[in-house]
């Protein structure tokens, strides 16, 4: 089907090139229309008219004669034939002739007829069109599908060269045929064309040859291969199959036997080992050998294990990396949570500080308005004639007098001292303390903070025992000193014992 479509396209392009090279003149169109009008009026004169048209050609290119005509009807004509020959061929084929009507210039609409003479429309498969068979001029008709079914050639049977007849092959295209013609070839012809093409012989015929790839060898195809339907657009599927790759790691596959005969003397092959499909790893790398055996050179099972192990290790690496990333993210999240907690604590501390500042400000406001009264400093209750005056110490805390609280220990009140100072022209805050508030002089024969003076009282003996216990003397000596202290009777002996004890300790 693909070769036939290519043929139609090629011939159509040739017609277009011919029309562009030699445009059809108006005189030729009028003569053709007049001839077709005469044919429609006198069908019996078709053959004579056709011969006259062949004798007096108007200069049109033969491939384009059949492309111009009525757009409504008419049987298809063979390239190079006239109108009369078309009707004669129709009578030979058993197809009733149709009257041709003259109309405006345009492309001819072709019709296909079956054996009963009825027009067949809507046919998409060109293999089912009734066409002229062969290249030898035989006028017998054959259908594309019927021909392929009735052919003596067994489809899929390999020839002597090892190729099966699975397609139509390459057929030369004649330059003199019309674009609407469809060529068919017998199975034997296709077989011969494929054989010649495989051997590289040149075709003596004119035209171009479509190259067809050699069909696959059915012997090498896998038994479980599924057939592949190619783009033949026909009812029969091609016998192409999916062939599983026979390449396996570990060994070089054996070569296919060549059908050609050797041109020279052959080499002895007695020592050649038999071909194998797989080879196991038999040598490890050693520094002496200098060769490295890759794990990929093992058999298929070991190679599969190697790839599986490599893939597994890659997956494990990815999992480890993801786990590490997840762990780092968890650490970052924990640190962020701790920062959020610290932020909350800082906010609470700020609030507490603000509250304390408010409390301190409130206390300062209250203290600034408090007046502290000191007893005994006002009007003397025993002297009703005394002048009433405000106590100078009744002031805020911040503005207190430096002589405050001294009136209780001085001989004279502050008021009388101030009046006396004013009369003398100066003020003085100094005064004499009352006798009961004055300190007595320190006695040298009595114990005080200045020194210890032992006496006959129990307190003196307790102080001496404490001095002996807190010293760094040995325990035996401490016990001996305690015994001597208990035997001393009198103040003078006790004072001498104290002096001796202090000398022993200070050594």
UniProtKB/Swiss-Prot annotation:
Region (Interaction with the L polymerase): 361-377, 396-410
Any one of the GO BP annotations: DNA-templated transcription
Keywords: Phosphoprotein, Viral RNA replication
Annotated region (Disordered), positions in chain: 41-99, 134-163, 201-230, 252-273
Keyword Electron transport: no
Region span, X domain (XD): 457-507
Phosphoserine PTM positions: 86, 151
Region annotated Interaction with N0, chain positions: 1-48
Region of interest called Interaction with the nucleocapsid (N-RNA), as start-end residue ranges on this chain: 459-507
Post-translational modification note: Phosphorylation on serines by host CK2 is necessary for the formation of viral factories.
Keyword Phosphoprotein (UniProt): yes
Domain notes: The N-terminus consists of a long intrinsically disordered tail. The central part contains the coiled-coil multimerization domain (MD). Forms a four-stranded coiled coil structure. The C-terminus constitutes the alpha-helical domain (XD) that binds to the nucleocapsid (N-RNA complex).
Task performed by this protein: Essential cofactor of the RNA polymerase L that plays a central role in the transcription and replication by forming the polymerase complex with RNA polymerase L and recruiting L to the genomic N-RNA template for RNA synthesis. Also plays a central role in the encapsidation of nascent RNA chains by forming the encapsidation complex with the nucleocapsid protein N (N-P complex). Acts as a chaperone for newly synthesized free N protein, so-called N0, allowing encapsidation of nascent RNA chains during replication.
Family classification: Belongs to the morbillivirus P protein family.
Protein name: Phosphoprotein
Organism encoding this protein: Measles virus (strain Edmonston-Moraten vaccine) (MeV)
Name of encoding gene: P
């Amino acid at each position: 089907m693909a070769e036939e479509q290519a043929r139609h396209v090629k011939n159509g392009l040739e017609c277009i090139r011919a029309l562009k090279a030699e445009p059809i003149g108006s005189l030729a169109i009028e003569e053709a229309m007049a001839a077709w009008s005469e044919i429609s009026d006198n069908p019996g004169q078709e053959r004579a008219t056709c011969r006259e048209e062949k004798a007096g050609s108007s200069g049109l290119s033969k491939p384009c004669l059949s492309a111009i005509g009525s757009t409504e009807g008419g049987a298809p004509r063979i390239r190079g034939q006239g109108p009369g020959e078309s009707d004669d061929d129709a009578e030979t084929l058993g197809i009733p002739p149709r009257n041709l009507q003259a109309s405006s210039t345009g492309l001819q609409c072709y019709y296909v007829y079956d054996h009963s003479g009825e027009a067949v429309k809507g046919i998409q498969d060109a293999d089912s069109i009734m066409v002229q068979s062969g290249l030898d001029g035989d006028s017998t008709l054959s259908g594309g599908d019927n021909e392929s079914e009735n052919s003596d050639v067994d489809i899929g049977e390999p020839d002597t060269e090892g190729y099966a007849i699975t397609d139509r092959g390459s057929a030369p295209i004649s330059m003199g045929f019309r674009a609407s013609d469809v060529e068919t070839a017998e199975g034997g012809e296709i077989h011969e064309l494929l054989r010649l093409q495989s051997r590289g012989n040149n075709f003596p015929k004119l035209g171009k040859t479509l190259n067809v790839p050699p069909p696959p060898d059915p012997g090498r195809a896998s038994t479980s291969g599924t057939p592949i339907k190619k783009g033949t657009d026909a009812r029969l599927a091609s016998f192409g199959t999916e062939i599983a790759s026979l390449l396996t790691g570990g060994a070089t596959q054996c070569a296919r036997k060549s059908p050609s005969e050797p041109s020279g003397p052959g080499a002895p092959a007695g020592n050649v080992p038999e071909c194998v499909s797989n080879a196991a790893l038999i040598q490890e790398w050693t520094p002496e050998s200098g060769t490295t055996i890759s794990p990929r050179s093992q058999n298929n099972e070991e190679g599969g294990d190697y790839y599986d192990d490599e893939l597994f290790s890659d997956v494990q690496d990815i999992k480890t990396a993801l786990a590490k990333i997840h762990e780092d993210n968890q650490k970052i999240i924990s640190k962020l949570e701790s920062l959020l907690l610290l932020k909350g604590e800082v906010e609470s501390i700020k609030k507490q500080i603000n509250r304390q500042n408010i409390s301190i400000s409130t206390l300062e406001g209250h203290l600034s308005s408090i007046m502290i009264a000191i007893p005994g400093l006002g009007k003397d209750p025993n002297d009703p004639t005394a002048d009433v005056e405000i106590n100078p110490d009744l002031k805020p805390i911040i503005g207190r007098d430096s002589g405050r609280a001294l009136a209780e220990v001085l001989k004279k009140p502050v008021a009388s001292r101030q009046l006396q100072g004013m009369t003398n022209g100066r003020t003085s805050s100094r005064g004499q303390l009352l006798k009961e508030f004055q300190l007595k002089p320190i006695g040298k024969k009595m114990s005080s903070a200045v020194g210890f003076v032992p006496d006959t009282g129990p307190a003196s003996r307790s102080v001496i025992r404490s001095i002996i216990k807190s010293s760094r003397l040995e325990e035996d000596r401490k016990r001996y000193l305690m015994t001597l202290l208990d035997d001393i009777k009198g103040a003078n002996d006790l004072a001498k014992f104290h002096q001796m004890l202090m000398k022993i300790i200070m050594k």
